[in-house]
A protein has these predicted regions:
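Accessory nucleic-acid engagement/destabilization modules that flank
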Residues: 8, 20-23
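N-terminal alpha-helical targeting/anchoring segments
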Residues: 6-14
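Short, small-residue-biased leader/transition segments that mark boundaries at the very start
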Residues: 1-5
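Helix N-cap motif at beta-to-alpha junctions
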Residues: 14-20
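Conserved short beta-strand edge segments in small beta-sheet-based binding/regulatory domains
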Residues: 32-53
Length: 358
């Protein structure tokens, strides 16, 4: 019995000394999925006898407070995303307690919906029921939303939005166009990584003649087709952080030469936002590539664009179409880049999925 305060996490537990110690050991050895336990401090406290379990509303605090990084879309949400019977079918912003934006949408602490950009989107009745029910996977999931009440994608300068915008974007990619896509922490510039002329044009427009471009591959099977890698790299590719991982290219791969010219390696990541998954797989009849160049949407020396205004003023000249959405990004977050040495991973650029973890 007891209660839980959502500060960092404060648990008031009552029971036999053995039971309380077992709880502590369980937290240390089997922490909740995707959680990071920095330290457990325990002390005896004078409390009246508990007769129930409660989760107490968050309190504002001064001092150092842990902030969660953004978390790649989880397998359960992926399943719902492509389940025609699910009310979040093809919803570009599906999330739950195990995944979704965190740092990038946060205005202030503690992390509650009213202090995030999801405050712009009042929950519908169905989402509110899930949000307030401890038995659901979306209990207290701050960005929870659905097709009825959530953010919406659209093409800047066009009336196309929602499904029409996604289909138009996919068609543009397959026609050899360059697009800008707003993701979790900012915009990417994107094109078909198998289309030599499209990749060369992107390089010319961005004035990036030789530096390798990152690619996003549809799934781990596509990654295996294009690159050689071992268990350590696969864990990085498929983990909840979804960084860019530097991998050895296969000579038999289908990525065009201009992706990483005269370079034996290429930076690869897998889709980490629901919108990325929908770019690769959507119920619209478009035959889509499984390989996309996905490079930071910025001008040289500037941070990644995070708003429509940024995109229009800085990268509109680099692309033919801008796919955006109306969930505001407060904190920019570029893709983390990782490599391995002697079988151990190390970070080259620390950002999305890892920041602000110490």
């Amino acid at each position: 019995l007891g209660d839980v305060y959502k500060r960092q996490v404060e648990i008031h537990a009552q029971g036999s000394e053995k039971a309380v110690e077992e709880l502590k050991k369980a937290l240390e050895s089997r922490p909740p999925e995707r959680s990071v336990i920095m330290e457990i401090i325990s002390a005896h406290a004078d409390e009246p006898p508990f007769d129930s379990f409660e989760i107490i509303e968050s309190e504002k605090e001064k001092g150092d407070i842990f902030v969660s990084p953004d978390i790649a879309v989880c397998e359960k949400c992926k399943g719902e995303l492509f389940d025609k019977t699910n009310r979040r079918y093809l919803h570009p912003f599906i999330n739950c307690t195990q995944c979704g934006p965190r740092l990038t949408i946060m205005d202030s602490m503690p992390y509650d919906r009213v202090r995030t950009t999801m405050a712009d989107f009042p929950m519908c009745k169905d989402c509110e029921e899930e949000y307030t029910d401890p038995a659901t996977r979306r209990y207290d999931a701050q960005p929870v939303c659905c097709n009825k009440c959530g953010p919406e994608v659209y093409i800047i300068g066009s009336e196309k939005k929602g499904a029409e915008a996604i289909t138009a974007t996919r068609e543009a990619v397959m026609a050899g166009k360059i697009i800008a896509v707003k993701g979790i922490g900012g915009f990417h510039l994107c094109c078909d990584a198998k289309n030599e002329s499209a990749v060369k044009r992107l390089r010319e427009l961005k004035n990036r003649p030789a530096k390798p471009l990152a690619v996003m591959l549809k799934d781990i099977s596509a990654a295996r087709r294009e690159c050689d890698f071992g268990e350590v790299q696969e864990k990085l590719l498929t983990g909840w952080q979804k960084p860019i991982v530097l991998l050895d290219k296969k000579t038999s791969g289908s990525l065009c030469e201009s992706v990483a010219p005269d370079n034996p390696t290429v930076g690869v990541m897998l889709p980490y936002a629901p919108l990325h998954l929908l770019l690769f797989d959507y119920d619209d009849g478009v035959e889509m590539t499984d390989s996309l160049v996905m490079t930071s949407g910025n001008v040289r020396g500037a941070p990644i664009c995070r708003s429509d205004e940024d995109a229009l003023s800085e990268i509109a000249g680099f692309c033919d179409l801008i796919l955006s959405h109306n969930r505001r990004i407060l904190i920019r977050s570029d893709d983390t880049v990782m490599d391995t040495f002697e079988g151990k991973p190390y970070i080259i650029r620390r950002s999305r999925g890892y920041a602000p973890l110490p």
